[in-house]
UniProtKB/Swiss-Prot annotation:
Signal peptide limits: 1-31
GO cellular component, one term: extracellular region
Keyword tags: Autism, Autism spectrum disorder, Glycoprotein, Secreted, Signal
Localization per record: Secreted
Secreted recorded as keyword: yes
Glycosylation: residue positions: N100
Name of the protein: Divergent protein kinase domain 2B
Source lineage: Eukaryota, Metazoa, Chordata, Craniata, Vertebrata
Reported disease: Genetic variations in CXorf36 may be associated with susceptibility to autism.
Pfam family, one: PIP49_C
Amino acid sequence: MEPQLGPEAAALRPGWLALLLWVSALSCSFSLPASSLSSLVPQVRTSYNFGRTFLGLDKCNACIGTSICKKFFKEEIRSDNWLASHLGLPPDSLLSYPANYSDDSKIWRPVEIFRLVSKYQNEISDRRICASASAPKTCSIERVLRKTERFQKWLQAKRLTPDLVQGLASPLLRCPSQRLLDRVVRRYAEVADAGSIFMDHFTDRDKLRLLYTLAVNSHPILLQIFPGAEGWPLPKYLGSCGRFLVSTSTRPLQEFYDAPPDQAADLAYQLLGVLESLRSNDLNYFFYFTHIDAGMFGVFNNGHLFIRDASAVGVIDKQEGSQEANRAGENKDIFSCLVSGCQAQLPSCESISEKQSLVLVCQKLLPRLLQGRFPSPVQDDIDSILVQCGDSIRPDPEVLGAASQLKDILRPLRTCDSRFAYRYPDCKYNDKF
């Protein structure tokens, strides 16, 4: 039989129970495994360790950088779907993830978190690195890359020159000029003191990260050296952590394939305008796409169209000229093979025509936006011009002329209202918008 408590003891019972529960919880916090503990109390270190592997920090300095890692660890970059490690992280199979970003934990704005390449491709690349040194599959990737002849040249270099990037598969470096490479170094955001064309302020770690990024995917470099704040059609680069980069958020163009006719006309008009600015600009750089799909373009919430993925963008310097890279297989090494087969042949700089990007867009994207949207005879004119614009056999002037005609047709098909905030209300008072 349970002993009976006196009045005073009975009165104290709720307090004793609370104290016992507190002591019990405290003792459990020293004895529970980490997996159970994380569900009771926020554990910064536990979340940090889990995040390192997912973000690829365990592979650094064979990574993009670490400039935005603190935001991840302070949970100032987060999503409703993966707020902390014990709630589960996104599937590894994705190349990008929507998230929210804050500088003060009060005001949040949408961002996208990108992998440079898929997790599967990263694993293949890492195995290639180990195999290049006849090392086990779980070798120190950084140690192997540091011992390469190319990186040893980088360590001695004071300036990034075309010979140091020859053989890399990135379209950005296919036809490099010294002016372009100086711009890469001067605007590289993953070092503390950017601004100089010389790499005196680069540590060994900084040089390896830059080389690795250029070898795997030049998308984050293009965001840094041609920023949207200066009028380039690219989203803002917010920083990198491990093998991920963070940039401002856009909706992929394919989400607008069923848009109303006036919105489709506006996006097509913008798309042609973007290609025109890449072909002709004040800095005399000619940008071209090696291939195109709808996921490479995105639309901000104000209706403005930008290049969402610049990994397939090449650059030719029309002012200074370019030095042909990778002649006769020269300077091919493990850095040349991280994302493609070492035997992959790249087109020569001279084979890149002014019409190349236009032809690709007119073949693959504009028909999905414009076909069957407008009444005759406007639709007939659009369809006819798309055939001319997408004909790779036609001379450059004919393709460029067809694109200009298409812009003239699309301009009056656009409407002026708040859906197009990037040009509203200016469009009410100025035909330019």
